[in-house]
């Protein structure tokens, strides 16, 4: 007891754990209440000191857990004391098993009438699909016929429909072959005639006029119904334009 309390650097401890244990043991010895055996557990290891310096006494640990102790179930009536408890539970369990059986029998007996009413619908469905099918009840009372019978659909071709081969090619926007040869021959005649009378001009204005004349000749055909334009008038106008342009270039 003559030892001075150790003072660590930076921390001042009023009382150590060892001194707390000594004081606790001295207090227990003075009161005469030292608990024996495994009923109480004394902490021999040092416990970390708290800031308030309090010491907590551990609770005694019993060998049997609390939820298995008999004292808590003193108010309950055990099955050993009351022998009729098991009989009542067993009877109630048998009653719950016996009641669903009539329900199961009723549910099992109901589908026996269901297939008879269900078989009539496929035959009506087949009768509505197949025209002229017999309505004899003796034939329909047999087993179900699952054979596939394709329904003959009526032809939906309209009366005013014409085949693509009978279309008039002259009304289409594509040029026929005969007209292209005629235009080429006409342009060849014009070029030969102009070369015999006057020399050919290769200036930019004349070439542009020639291209315009060729494009106009490609879009206007003599046998089309959509354009009311005479090809002879177009050819003569193009011819006079080229003649005047050539004269302007050489003048």
UniProtKB/Swiss-Prot annotation:
<dbReference type="GO" id="GO:0003677">
    <property type="term" value="F:DNA binding"/>
</dbReference>
<comment type="subunit">
    <text>Interacts with POU2F3 in a DNA-dependent manner; this interaction increases POU2F3 transactivation activity.</text>
</comment>
<dbReference type="InterPro" id="IPR043265">
    <property type="entry name" value="OCAT2"/>
</dbReference>
<keyword id="KW-0804">Transcription</keyword>
<keyword id="KW-0010">Activator</keyword>
<dbReference type="InterPro" id="IPR047571">
    <property type="entry name" value="OCA"/>
</dbReference>
<feature type="compositionally biased region" description="Low complexity">
    <location>
        <begin position="31"/>
        <end position="40"/>
    </location>
</feature>
<comment type="function">
    <text>Transcriptional coactivator that specifically associates with POU2F3. This complex drives the development of tuft cells, a rare a rare chemosensory cells that coordinate immune and neural functions within mucosal epithelial tissues.</text>
</comment>
<feature type="domain" description="OCA">
    <location>
        <begin position="5"/>
        <end position="27"/>
    </location>
</feature>
<dbReference type="GO" id="GO:0005737">
    <property type="term" value="C:cytoplasm"/>
</dbReference>
<dbReference type="GO" id="GO:0005654">
    <property type="term" value="C:nucleoplasm"/>
</dbReference>
<dbReference type="GO" id="GO:0005634">
    <property type="term" value="C:nucleus"/>
</dbReference>
<dbReference type="GO" id="GO:0070974">
    <property type="term" value="F:POU domain binding"/>
</dbReference>
<feature type="region of interest" description="Disordered">
    <location>
        <begin position="24"/>
        <end position="45"/>
    </location>
</feature>
<keyword id="KW-0963">Cytoplasm</keyword>
<keyword id="KW-0539">Nucleus</keyword>
<dbReference type="GO" id="GO:0005829">
    <property type="term" value="C:cytosol"/>
</dbReference>
<protein>
    <recommendedName>
        <fullName>POU class 2 homeobox associating factor 3</fullName>
    </recommendedName>
</protein>
<keyword id="KW-0805">Transcription regulation</keyword>
<comment type="similarity">
    <text>Belongs to the POU2AF family.</text>
</comment>
<dbReference type="GO" id="GO:0003713">
    <property type="term" value="F:transcription coactivator activity"/>
</dbReference>
């Amino acid at each position: 007891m003559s030892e001075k309390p150790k003072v660590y650097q930076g921390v001042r401890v009023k009382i150590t754990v060892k001194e707390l244990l000594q004081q606790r043991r001295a207090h227990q010895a003075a009161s005469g209440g030292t608990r024996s055996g495994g009923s109480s557990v004394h902490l021999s290891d040092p416990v970390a000191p708290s800031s308030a310096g309090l010491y907590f006494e551990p609770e005694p640990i019993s060998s049997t857990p609390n939820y298995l102790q008999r004292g808590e179930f003193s108010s309950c009536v055990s099955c050993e004391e009351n022998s009729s408890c098991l009989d009542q539970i067993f009877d109630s369990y048998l009653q719950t098993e016996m009641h669903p059986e009539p329900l199961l029998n009723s549910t099992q007996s109901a589908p026996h009438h269901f297939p008879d009413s269900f078989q009539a619908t496929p035959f009506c469905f087949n009768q509505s699909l197949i025209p002229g099918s017999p309505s004899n009840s003796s034939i329909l009372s047999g087993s179900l016929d699952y054979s596939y019978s394709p329904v003959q659909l009526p032809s939906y071709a309209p009366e005013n429909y014409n085949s693509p081969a009978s279309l008039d090619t002259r009304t289409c926007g594509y040029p026929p072959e005969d007209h292209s040869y005629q235009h080429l021959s006409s342009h060849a005649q014009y070029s030969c005639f102009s070369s015999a009378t006057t020399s050919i001009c290769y200036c930019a204005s004349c070439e542009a006029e020639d291209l315009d004349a060729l494009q106009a000749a490609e879009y206007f055909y003599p046998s089309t119904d959509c354009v009311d334009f005479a090809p002879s008038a177009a050819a003569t106008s193009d011819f006079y334009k080229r003649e005047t342009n050539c004269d302007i270039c050489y003048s």
